[in-house]
A protein has these predicted regions:
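Extracellular/periplasmic catalytic domains that process cell-envelope and extracellular macromolecules
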Residues: 16-19, 53-57, 86-88, 118, ...
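Beta->alpha turn/N-cap motifs
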Residues: 2-15, 19-21, 26-30, 131, ...
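Pocket-lining segment of extracytoplasmic ligand-binding domains
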Residues: 89-184
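Short amphipathic alpha-helical segments and helix-helix/interface helices
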Residues: 14, 82-85, 135
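Short beta-strand->loop
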Residues: 22-55, 68, 124, 158-184
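A residue-level structural signature of the nucleotidyltransferase/glycosyltransferase Rossmann-like core
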Residues: 5-6, 61, 92, 145
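A conserved helix-loop-strand patch within extracytoplasmic ligand-binding domains
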Residues: 28-101
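"Short basic amphipathic alpha-helical interaction patches in structured regions
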Residues: 21, 76-80, 106-111
């Protein structure tokens, strides 16, 4: 189809084509104040906040909602217990399409590393057309877990009750139960 001297591609596409191109620049974004791969560290009763520091990556999270199952999983994590595949497979998941880094690919890799299974192996995974659809499903109890970029609560905490149907503040109804490695 032709050639280009410069192009903008995702980190995932770079991995696929790294033999054919070089990195000249990389994107930066504002970091958030929570960066641990331990989900319990994210559940301190405060919503993640943007910082003045720049970061070359972000993380994907597994966010448990206010449903009975979501709160059961969150309680296990906050008590220092390891989640099992059966724990996760018995939940209803809201996921993005299979090309989404934070909404599918990295959570699938996280599952693969821990359980030898991926999102495709889950009994109850529902594909959402947007993160706001996933948030609505989470708030209403249609989903127990959603996968998303790590700063989703920073972006949507103010809308949790009014737009998504939450019955309490987002920080009180959700919690992080899994955190992926950095997405570049």
């Amino acid at each position: 189809a032709g050639s280009a001297d410069i192009g903008f591609i995702s980190g995932g596409n770079y991995v696929l084509f790294s033999d054919d191109c070089d990195v000249l620049l990389t994107a930066l974004r504002y970091a958030i104040n929570k960066d641990s791969e331990n989900p319990k560290d994210w559940n301190d009763g405060t919503i993640e906040e943007n910082t003045d520091e720049m970061s070359t990556y972000y993380r994907s999270i597994l966010l448990a909602g206010p449903s009975e199952k979501g709160q059961e999983l969150l309680a296990k994590v906050n008590n220092g217990e390891e989640l099992t595949w059966d724990d996760l497979n018995s939940a209803t998941w809201a996921v993005m399409g299979p090309t989404s880094a934070s909404g599918y690919i990295y959570p699938a890799l996280w599952l693969q590393e821990r359980y030898g299974k991926t999102i495709a192996d889950l009994d109850n995974a529902v594909q959402s057309d947007s993160y706001t659809t996933s948030l609505s499903r989470l708030a209403s109890g249609q989903a127990d877990i959603m996968v998303s970029y790590g700063h989703i609560r920073t972006k949507y905490a103010a809308d949790w009750k009014e737009k998504f149907g939450g019955t309490d503040d987002m920080v009180n109804q959700t919690g992080v139960i899994g955190v992926t490695e950095g997405i570049y």
